[in-house]
Each structure stands twice: as C-alpha cells, then as structure tokens.
C-alpha cells in the first residue's frame, strides 16, 4: 500500500520529563484529542493507556517506552492531516537507558515540566541526553492549576540550570485555581477552553486587560528571537516592519530545528487545557524526518554511507527495543530511516550477519496492536518473527548493506545472587532471565563458577528489584535475592623459591609417586604463566603438563579466602619420578601441593575491584560529593566543568565494595540533582582492615 501521509507531515516525538511532571497524563490527553481514546485514562486510577505493564500502573511510574501514534489536523481543524508517532519515556534515573534509546530514534522531543517543581534533577539528565543526540525540543509547563504554579520561574530555571534558550510562544491566563487558558503570543489572542466538553471546545478571545502589557513584552521577545533566524528577517524587523504570523512561525521553526531555541508553552493536562495547542506546536516547530540530517552509517568494508528519509532509497532501520508479548511472543520495535519494507520480505542484519524473514508488522497504540502490510521511511513499528535481532541492531536491504551507528549501553554497576524459591523453578528462572536480558541491554545474567549461583547485574537497586518483580508476574517464578556482592581476587607480593610438593603412596600394590619443585613469583598484569625449566629428564616429558594442570586446578581457590588467584608465574625447576609408581595423577597432586605451599610463603594479598566513578553534579553540591567519595576510600582524580555549563564532573576511583547504596545516598546528598556512572577499572590491593574482614567472613 502506498504511503498515506507524506513524510513532511510526519512527526516522531518523545514526551520526556521528570517523574510526576504529568507526562503520561499529557500523552493520554493527546490520544483523547486526536480521537483515539474516547474515555481518558487517568494515572490516578491506574488506567492510563501508555502505562501498560502492571508494575507501572501500581507504582504510577512509566518504565518501558511504549510507542503509539495518532493523526492531527490542528486545534481548529485548519492543518492538513499530520501523523504523530509518540514514544513515551520513563523519568526515573534507574531507567535512563530507556530514555537514551528512545532519544536515538526520535526527531524531536516535548519536555514536560511541573509548573511548581520546575526543572528537576531528572530533567537535567534527560536534557543532557537530548543534547547528546541533538534532538530539537519544545517545552510544555504542565499543572498550571497547582498551588504555587509559576510559568516564568520555569523559564528562568531552563536558562540557569539547563543553559537552554527558552522562547515562550504562550503565557498563562491566571494560575492555580484561576488558571483559565493561555495567551497565544503569535496571534496575540487569548485561548480559553470549555470544561464541559473536557476541553474539546475552545474559543479565541481578546487578551484580558491586566495581561496586555506582559503579553506585549513577551511577544516582542519572541519576535526578536524569530528575527534572528536570517539576515532578511532581521533587516525587516530592525527597519520597524511587523513580521507576519507565517514569518514568525517559519523562523521559530528553523531556529528550533537548529537547536538554537526551545519554544515554551503551558497548560494543565489534567484539567484539559493547553494540550491541543501543544500538539499544534509539535506540528509548527518540531522537524519531520526530512528536516533533520540524514542518518550516517558504514558499509561492509567500513566505507562511510548515508541514507536519506526517502521511500525510493534502499531499506534501512534500527531496532531500538525488544518486548515480550504474551500473545505474539517477541516484538522488535524499529524505526525506518529509508526505503520501504513489506511483511514477508527478507531483511539483513549486518551486525549478526544473518538474513531473516520479516513476519507480521504491527503498529502499536499503547498496548493495542493493528496489523499492517508495509512501513515506509519515518515510520515506527514492531516486527514479529525476527529471531536474531537485539537492541541497537541495523536491519537493511540484503542487496544494499549499511550498518547504522550502534547505541552505547553502560556497563551494569550492581550485582546480586538470585535463586528460585522452589527447586522446580530453576529452569523456568533461567528462561525468564534470558528473555529479560534480551529486552534490556543494561541487564546481564551469568553463573558464578565459584559458587554456582546465578548472578544478575543491572543499573541500580530499583532496576534489579523491578526485573525480579517482572520475573514473578510474567513468568511465574518467585525468587529470593542475596546481598550485593564484590568479586575479590588473590595474588602474591614476594618470591617463594624451591618449594616442593611430594605425593607418595607406596603401601602394597600399585603405588603413586609424584615430586615437583617450583619457584613462585609475582607476574603483575600478565595473569598466570607456567615455565618448564626441567633439565636432564628428572621429570619425564609426558608428566610436565600434569604439574601445570594441578596448579591450574588450585588457581580457582586461593589460600586466603578461596578467591581466584591472578598474576603469578610458576617455574618448574626440579623433581623426581619412580619408574613404576609415577603417573599423571600423582604429578597433578604434586603440582597442586607445591603451589598451595608456595602461595602461603609468598606473602599472599587480597585484591579488590576499583571502579572509575564519574559524578555529574550542580556546583553547589560538589563539596558534599567529594567529601562523601573520600569517606568511601575514593581517590578524587580531578574535576571539570560540564560543557555548556550546568555543573561539574568529578572523576574518582573508588572500591566497588564502598559503592553499594550509592545512588540512594547521592540523591539525598544533592537533592536528587547529581547523577553518576561507574565502570570497572582494575584490581588493586585491599587495605589490611578490609582483607581481615573479608577473610574472616569467608572463613566463618
């Protein structure tokens, strides 16, 4: 089926905000006014369409970015029909990965702010992510009906905290209980919404007397911002000529898409005021897929390639999310950047080097689905039947291969052991964890070789809590989780010369005889090394690998606390054998005994993992952050300004053992405004007090 809406009338947008700024309610109202939802779902009732996982409805926070779409002809029905694809994004810091991956496939974003709370910590994180992917944005100041609502304070905070350049295109008429509508600064008219029709009906009226001076002041600021779009407009403006409505909107649009300004609007989604005008602003100011730079990638020989948002180009798309659906199995959400694809077509995944047949194509309206036959450049849809694709993979035309830039996902920072409450659930738990890890690239699962336990790792304590919860709800597996754990290692500081291991059993019948002499020495950063220095055949050739094997067996459990041994060099220097009683097993035992003894003599020490920690914090909390890192045995390595203003970055090296509970602590230290990332750096010697505690705990 040919494209129904021309691509210049597409808008792919994300609605992004801090928790409780009213983002989900705003999306619900959009779906209502665009005629999709006839009864508005309120988050208070746990009935919102976009929040479709059970935990989201219980907790009232959005965890997975559901993708949905709607059609819009303008508030007054005066626009040609536009197609708006909306990705709802979470606002909690442990789900930053979800925001990051949706930013990657958006063309524009609508930032929702609470008129009372204003620019919150999470808003700063989301803003940085939008900057990273150069996403043009508009701002919607929501909850104007709340006590303490202040539109102009949010405008100041956007300048000061986010270093943004907000340009109000509306100002509120009244606030708190008296919030009635907005002044449209382009038309210089007030808009008031009718309560009885849930805001569907509205009218333009003259600006109330008491607001005229304020409206004129902000209108002039807006026109000045528009005039800076190009020389011709600036000359016209400076020459005292009035700019037309079309010129103002066109100029603001160009500057928004260039990332120079952020048009600001206001309203109350809950009270059904202002959402339709915000939709008009999405059409007026945010880009269509052809207004943004073409997507970059590279070919199979690493040559740079690009694809334009055009149906005639070869098909290319990015898989940005995987979800498991109870009815159809795995859904892969993808964004089409160029070309078209039909259900039943074969697509190529250059990352996995596999061809796959595209089964059904579904378009989602929250969690209801409509099956469609084809998708085109600019579309967002979900595919059924792709077995190999994972988040961040490219899908493309098999004859025109392109690999789009991959998404980067942070390494998990916290691990916990998890075991099923009943033994019978072991297999089910394995399946559930693998399915969850496929959906969420920031969640990892592995089996600990030392303890045999299943270890899960993720981005924070809430992240793991929600995944364990999902395992219970979606897969029916009840699990218990252990305390967060640290992976220590053991090594040595000194050389132990000529240490012998003798394994002799000679009491009737076939005996055992193995005798090996080794020298053990530190081998920093090089792992385990075995050197054969046997001369004159004192140990026969065929038994030497057995000595090495015996030592390797012992490496897994050190002498201090049973942790793996790293960075040691063993030289096999001497030994003896018996013609009849010597065999592989005897030399394996001799090697193991010699190594254990040598370890004890070589001054063994405990190593702990050190993490590179980066904290982004507003300047006023920097002292607290540095003091706290020092109290965690951290070494601060330097600080720098965040580019574009907005605080400082502190670089430090901190032992992993001291970082548990850090996200909660950091939130309270900085009133939730600082964020951090950490990744493994290297192993370092643990201080004596730490070693003693770990060893005695292990021996107990």
Swiss-Prot record:
Residues 8-290 form the tr-type G domain. The keyword Protein biosynthesis applies. InterPro entries: EFG_II, EFG_III, EFG_III/V, EFG_IV, EFG_V, EFG_V-like, EFTu-like_2, G_TR_CS. It holds the Pfam family EFG_IV. One of its GO terms (molecular function) is translation elongation factor activity. CDD domains: EF-G, EFG_III, EFG_mtEFG1_IV, EFG_mtEFG_C, EFG_mtEFG_II. PANTHER family: RIBOSOME-RELEASING FACTOR 2, MITOCHONDRIAL, TRANSLATION ELONGATION FACTOR G-RELATED. Belongs to the TRAFAC class translation factor GTPase superfamily. Classic translation factor GTPase family. EF-G/EF-2 subfamily. This is Elongation factor G 2. It comes from Ralstonia nicotianae (strain ATCC BAA-1114 / GMI1000) (Ralstonia solanacearum).
């Amino acid at each position: 089926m040919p494209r129904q809406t021309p691509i210049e009338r597409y808008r792919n947008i994300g609605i992004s905000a801090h928790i409780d700024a009213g983002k989900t309610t705003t999306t619900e109202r959009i779906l209502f006014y665009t005629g999709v939802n006839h009864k508005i779902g309120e988050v208070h009732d746990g009935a919102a369409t976009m929040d479709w996982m059970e935990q989201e409805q219980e907790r009232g926070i959005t965890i997975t970015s559901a993708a949905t779409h709607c059609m819009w002809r303008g508030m007054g029905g005066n626009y040609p029909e536009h197609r708006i694809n909306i990705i709802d994004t979470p606002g909690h810091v442990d789900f930053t990965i979800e925001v990051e991956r949706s930013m990657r496939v958006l063309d524009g974003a609508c930032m929702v702010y609470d008129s009372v709370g204003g620019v919150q910590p999470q808003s700063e994180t989301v803003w940085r992510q939008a900057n990273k992917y150069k996403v043009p944005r508009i701002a919607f100041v929501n909850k104007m009906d709340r006590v303490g609502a202040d539109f102009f304070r949010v405008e100041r905070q956007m300048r000061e905290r986010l270093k943004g350049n907000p340009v109000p295109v509306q100002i509120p008429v009244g606030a708190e209980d008296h919030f009635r509508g907005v002044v449209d600064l382009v038309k210089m008219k007030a808009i008031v919404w009718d309560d009885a029709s849930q805001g569907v009906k509205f009218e333009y009226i003259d600006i109330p007397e008491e607001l005229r001076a304020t409206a004129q002041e902000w209108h002039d600021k807006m026109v000045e911002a528009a005039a800076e779009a190009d020389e011709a407009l600036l000359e016209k403006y400076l020459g005292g000529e009035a700019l037309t409505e079309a010129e103002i909107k066109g100029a603001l649009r160009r500057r928004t898409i260039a990332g120079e300004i952020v048009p600001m609007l206001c309203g109350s989604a809950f009270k059904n005021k202002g959402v339709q005008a915000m939709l008009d602003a999405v059409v007026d100011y945010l880009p269509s897929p052809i207004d943004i730079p073409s997507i970059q990638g590279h070919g199979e020989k690493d040559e740079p390639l690009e694809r334009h948002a055009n149906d005639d180009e070869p098909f290319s798309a990015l898989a940005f999310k995987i979800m498991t659906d109870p009815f159809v199995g795995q859904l892969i959400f993808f964004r089409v950047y160029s070309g078209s694809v039909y259900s039943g077509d074969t697509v190529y995944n250059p990352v996995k080097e596999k061809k796959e047949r595209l089964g059904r194509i579904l378009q989602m309206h929250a969690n209801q689905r409509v099956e469609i036959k084809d998708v085109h450049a600019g579309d967002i849809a979900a595919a059924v039947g792709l077995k190999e694709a994972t988040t961040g993979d490219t899908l493309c035309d098999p004859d025109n291969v392109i690999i789009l830039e991959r998404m980067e996902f942070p390494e998990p920072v916290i691990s916990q052991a998890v075991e099923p409450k009943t033994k019978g659930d072991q297999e089910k738990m394995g399946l559930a964890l693998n399915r969850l890890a496929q959906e969420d690239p920031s969640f990892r699962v592995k089996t600990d070789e030392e303890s045999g336990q299943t270890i899960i790792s993720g981005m924070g304590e809430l992240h793991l809590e929600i995944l364990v919860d999902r395992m219970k709800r979606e897969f029916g597996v009840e699990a218990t989780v252990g305390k967060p754990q640290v992976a220590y290692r053991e090594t040595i500081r000194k050389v132990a010369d000529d240490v012998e291991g003798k394994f002799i059993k000679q009491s009737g019948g076939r005996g055992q005889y193995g005798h090996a002499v080794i020298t053990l020495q530190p081998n920093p950063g090089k792992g385990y090394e075995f050197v054969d220095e046997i001369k004159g055949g004192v140990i026969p050739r065929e038994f030497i690998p057995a000595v090495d094997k015996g030592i390797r067996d012992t490496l897994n459990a050190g002498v201090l606390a049973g942790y793996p041994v790293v960075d040691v060099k063993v030289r096999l220097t001497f030994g003896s054998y018996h013609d009849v009683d010597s065999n592989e097993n005897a030399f394996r035992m001799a090697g193991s005994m010699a190594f254990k003894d040598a370890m004890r003599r070589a001054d063994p020490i405990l190593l702990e993992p050190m993490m590179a920690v980066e904290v982004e914090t507003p300047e006023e909390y920097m002292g607290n952050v540095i003091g706290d890192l020092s109290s965690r045995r951290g070494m601060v390595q330097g600080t720098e300004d965040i580019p574009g203003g907005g605080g400082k970055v502190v670089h430090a090296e901190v032992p992993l053992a001291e970082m548990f509970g850090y996200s909660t602590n950091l939130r309270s230290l900085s009133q939730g405004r600082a964020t951090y990332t950490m990744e493994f750096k290297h192993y370092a010697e643990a201080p004596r007090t730490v070693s003693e505690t770990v060893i005695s705990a292990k021996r107990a």
